[in-house]
């Protein structure tokens, strides 16, 4: 629970996460100008705190995580797309403090807890949200958020009662962040659209610079 509380507190300070997925060149160690690592370094320099690195069943994945950690020590790194016990094992090897899953899997969630890993489950339906709350999850990821709309969680609060804090993820851009936060979400996760071959989205850079502090 300490890791969960720490992540919730950190997201309260900066309610945004960037989700990245290294390609083969990144895994091979191509970390020069224009690389994913170079772009992450740029985001870290303007104050980004939270990055999820999409897990891959590749022995080079942990090495990439280590390089990001070394070059961008201010970033709080977690793993994205956790679906298997194999992925949990890699998470332990890398020593990452948290991971996100796109699905609600009670068996995987319990296994993560047994290994001291904070796994934030993905939820979509009212049933999944209620089950996650019953299992003691204080933080969940609504995925894909774009499919249900910004008011979805608010509409569930009356019939379901107290709910976990919610990260909105899936199909959202920088321009959506403020509306989803105002609707009561704890944070917003941004995916592939905020980093391309040209670098980080200038809108994201401005958002980070404006909210830094």
Regions found by a protein language model. Name each.
Residues 1-95, 114, 174-175, 194-213:
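Conserved N-terminal beta1-alpha1 strand-loop-helix module at the mouth
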Residues 20-24, 79-85, 101-104, 121-126, ...:
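Glycine-rich beta-to-alpha transition loops that act as phosphate-gripper elements at the mouths
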Residues 44-49, 71-74, 93-99, 113-120, ...:
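Glycine-enriched alpha-helix->loop->beta-strand junction motifs that scaffold or abut catalytic
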Residues 58-60, 86, 107-108, 127-129, ...:
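Short secondary-structure capping/turn micro-motifs that flank functional sites
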Residues 84-94, 127-135, 152, 172-188:
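Catalytic cores of alpha/beta
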Residues 102-108, 141-150, 183-204:
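Glycine-rich phosphate-binding active-site loops on the catalytic face of alpha/beta enzymes
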Residues 102-148:
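Histidine/lysine/aspartate-rich catalytic loop segments that bind and position anionic ligands
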Residues 131, 147, 151-159, 163-167:
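Shared catalytic-loop signature of beta/alpha-barrel
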């Amino acid at each position: 629970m300490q890791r969960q509380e720490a992540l919730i507190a950190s997201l309260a300070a900066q309610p945004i996460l960037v989700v990245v997925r290294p390609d083969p060149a990144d895994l091979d160690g191509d970390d020069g100008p224009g690389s994913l690592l170079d772009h992450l370094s740029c985001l870290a320099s303007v104050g980004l705190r939270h990055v999820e690195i999409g897990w891959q069943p590749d022995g080079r994945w942990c090495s990439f995580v280590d390089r990001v950690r070394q070059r961008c020590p201010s970033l709080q790194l977690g793993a994205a797309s956790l679906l298997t016990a194999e992925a949990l094992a890699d998470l332990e090897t890398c020593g990452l403090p948290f991971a996100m899953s796109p699905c609600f899997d009670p068996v995987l969630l319990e296994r993560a807890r047994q290994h001291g890993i904070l796994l934030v489950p993905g939820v979509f339906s009212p049933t999944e949200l209620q089950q996650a709350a019953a299992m003691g999850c204080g933080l969940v990821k609504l995925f894909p958020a774009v499919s249900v709309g910004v008011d979805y969680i608010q509409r569930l609060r009356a019939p379901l009662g107290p709910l976990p804090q919610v990260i909105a993820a899936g199909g959202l851009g920088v321009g959506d962040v403020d509306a989803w936060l105002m609707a009561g979400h704890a944070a917003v996760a941004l995916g592939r659209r905020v980093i391309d071959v040209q670098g980080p989205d200038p809108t994201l850079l401005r958002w980070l610079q404006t909210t830094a502090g």
